[in-house]
């Protein structure tokens, strides 16, 4: 009779979350994850063919959670302002995890950048206020607001700033207006 599996995919993903949210991706090793579960690395490799697959499954789980739980909260009538407020709140409430995902350099950085870009466009394309803007203007708004949001979030995560929702709304609306009026001026060019 085969032995019953005691460590499941969910256990492993929970251990990955603990490691990344306390140590960052620098701690993302089979040994560290196994140590969190107080086991050998064998269960990890029984569930995942390699660490790249585990990382991809983890990032997919994280982005689904961000999409469905974090970024769906509404504070204003503006989808871009709400994305920013949610991003800054997430950084403030989960500082190490935020830095691990969005600041530190790691193999999933491009995937997370694409997630942020795609989510922004999904929101603005379904919003009457923004949907008819040109792609150039939407890209300018995304770039400028994203750079500003990352800066604000980094300050919030390090407890150097604690902007209110109203302050965030005011700053982002100013950035949106500047981007609409001057789409050729972005913070990354």
Residue ranges of model-derived segments:
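Amphipathic alpha-helical packing segments from all-alpha helical-bundle domains
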Residues: 105-144, 170-180
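Basic, helix-initiating cap at the start of DNA-binding domains
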Residues: 1-23, 32, 53-56
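Alpha-helical DNA-contacting segments of helix-turn-helix folds
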Residues: 53-62, 70, 101, 105, ...
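Amphipathic C-terminal alpha-helical segment
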Residues: 97-100, 146-164, 177-188
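Append "Primarily bacterial transcriptional regulators
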Residues: 28-35, 44
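Amphipathic alpha-helical linker/stalk segments
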Residues: 56-83, 120-126
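HTH DNA-binding helix-turn interface
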Residues: 21-25, 38, 45-55
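Hydrophobic alpha-helical connector segments
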Residues: 70-96, 135, 145, 189
């Amino acid at each position: 009779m085969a032995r019953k599996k005691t460590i499941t995919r969910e256990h492993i993903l929970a251990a990955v979350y603990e490691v990344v949210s306390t140590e960052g991706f620098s701690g993302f090793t089979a040994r560290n994850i196994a140590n969190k579960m107080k086991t050998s690395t064998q269960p990890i490799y029984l569930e995942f063919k390699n660490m790249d697959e585990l990382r991809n499954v983890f990032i997919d789980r994280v982005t689904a959670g961000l999409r469905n739980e974090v970024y769906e909260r509404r504070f204003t009538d503006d989808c871009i302002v709400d994305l920013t407020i949610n991003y800054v709140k997430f950084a403030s409430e989960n500082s190490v995890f935020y830095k691990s995902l969005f600041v530190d350099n790691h193999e999933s950085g491009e995937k997370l950048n694409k997630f942020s870009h795609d989510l922004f466009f999904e929101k603005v394309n379904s919003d009457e206020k923004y949907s008819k803007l040109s792609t150039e203007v939407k890209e300018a708004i995304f770039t400028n607001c994203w750079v500003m949001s990352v800066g604000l979030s980094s300050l919030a995560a390090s407890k150097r700033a604690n902007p209110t929702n109203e302050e965030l709304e005011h700053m982002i609306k100013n950035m949106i207006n500047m981007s609409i009026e001057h789409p050729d001026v972005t913070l990354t060019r």
